Curated annotation (Swiss-Prot):
Keywords: ATP-binding, DNA-binding, Metal-binding, Nucleotide-binding, Repressor, Transcription, Transcription regulation, Zinc, Zinc-finger. Its cofactor is Zn(2+). Residues 48-138 form the ATP-cone domain. Binds 1 zinc ion. Belongs to the NrdR family. It holds the Pfam family Zn_ribbon_NrdR. The keyword DNA-binding applies. This is Transcriptional repressor NrdR. The gene is nrdR. One of its GO terms (molecular function) is ATP binding. HAMAP family: NrdR. The keyword Nucleotide-binding applies. It comes from Clostridioides difficile (strain 630) (Peptoclostridium difficile).
Amino acid sequence: MQCPYCNYKESKVIDSRHTDLKSIRRRRECESCKKRFTTYEKIETTPLMVIKKDNSREYFDREKIKYGLLKACEKRPVSIDEIESIVVHIENEINKCFIEEIETKKIGEMVMDKLKELDEVAYVRFASVYRQFKDINTFVNELKSILIEKGDK
């Protein structure tokens, strides 16, 4: 593995750990400059295509989910680990279905379900962008549904 600091081609593995069922985290040390860096290995699978609202298709990108979650959880008591856990959960749920295509609507619903469990404010933020809330009444209605749901528990 090439060193990201000095570009030397050889490094040794210091530590290997499974991060989830599909990836391995490796801590490496450059044999030239002795600096350490981390790499991740993942199983390569058939690429998943996402069907967008306009029916165009693009490759599934976990970073888009992560970015949306980061924006929704900004200034909220939600850790990066919790966000990463949601992304991994959604990826695993999609992979369990053995599908080659999925609609953005389905992914968005999965994200909202997990956010609703984690942080209601982040959920409303995400939902407002995802569902394109047009006015304050839409916000109020969404908040009412959350309050009603909480009352049922």
